[in-house]
Swiss-Prot record:
Protein name: Exodeoxyribonuclease 7 small subunit
Keywords per UniProt: Cytoplasm, Exonuclease, Hydrolase, Nuclease
Membrane-spanning segments: none
Signal peptide stretch: none
Role: Bidirectionally degrades single-stranded DNA into large acid-insoluble oligonucleotides, which are then degraded further into small acid-soluble oligonucleotides.
Example GO BP: DNA catabolic process
UniProt EC number: 3.1.11.6
Keyword Transcription regulation: no
Molecular function terms, GO-annotated: exodeoxyribonuclease VII activity
Ribonucleoprotein as UniProt keyword: no
Recorded catalytic activity of this chain's protein: Exonucleolytic cleavage in either 5'- to 3'- or 3'- to 5'-direction to yield nucleoside 5'-phosphates
Subcellular location: Cytoplasm
């Protein structure tokens, strides 16, 4: 069975659910560790998707002849 790749929005929604569950503090240590690990995986997925979108946008802007540098907040 093929697994469907998560969209950015699906990953963010799942990450928000995990954060709420961890903040609640009612999960066992083992469940909390599993959720934390899944959260790290989702964070990486979101970062990769954002980086890919940024590269696509930069390519489109460059092809249009209006190169605009991207600046990351807080860096």
């Amino acid at each position: 069975m093929a697994t469907k790749k998560k969209t950015f929005e699906e990953a963010i929604a799942e990450l928000e659910t995990i954060v709420e569950a961890l903040e609640n503090g009612s999960a066992s240590l083992e469940d909390s560790l599993d959720m934390y690990q899944k959260g790290i995986e989702l964070t990486k997925l979101c970062q990769d998707k954002l980086q890919s979108a940024e590269q696509r946008m930069a390519k489109v802007v460059t092809e249009a002849g209006e190169e605009i540098p991207f600046e990351a907040d807080g860096e």
